[in-house]
Amino acid sequence: DLLGSPSGARKQTLMLPIIYYAKKDIVDPNILISFPTNENIELHHIFPRAWFKDNENSNTFPNWYADKDLLRERRDCLVNLTPLAAQSNNTWKAKSPSTMLSNFTNKAQLPGKDIWTNRFIANNCHTALLNDQPESFMNFRAIEVAQWILDQTNI
């Protein structure tokens, strides 16, 4: 369901860690986005919708390209979303992850830092972002989120 389109209570449950575990904005790590905040927080498509459309080819999507419905579902799936401050969402807009990440200069934006790990973006996910590999990124991130959810249920 993390790579699909769940609805209702299932969607809300799966979104909880994605929305509430992140503490700082990616684009500007000085902006706190955790509750309570005065910032206007928006959900951002990590691989933006416009980017998906502009890069719809078999090189970018070797396993998904043949199925347009699957591509659309993956574009809007939960693991392609992350909370950002509204101003950061506007800065990122339709840019590829690699374009955005190449502009980061703050040490807090380095791989393995809280702004990534609190979003379930481990080093393998970060590498996929740097290489604009949405399939790898989403598969890796889905595993990270699912594992965290399972870990929370262990007694």
Name each model feature, range by range.
Residues K11, K23-K24, K53, K68, ...:
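Context-gated lysine
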Residues Q12-L16, I41, V79-T82, S98, ...:
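Non-catalytic, well-ordered alpha-helical scaffold segments
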Residues I41, K53-N89:
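Short beta-strand-alpha-helix junction that forms the catalytic/metal-binding core
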Residues P48-R49, N80, A94:
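Generic structural "secondary-structure junction" signal
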Residues E73-D76, A86-I155:
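Long, cytosolic, alpha-helical-rich C-terminal regions that act as interaction/scaffolding modules
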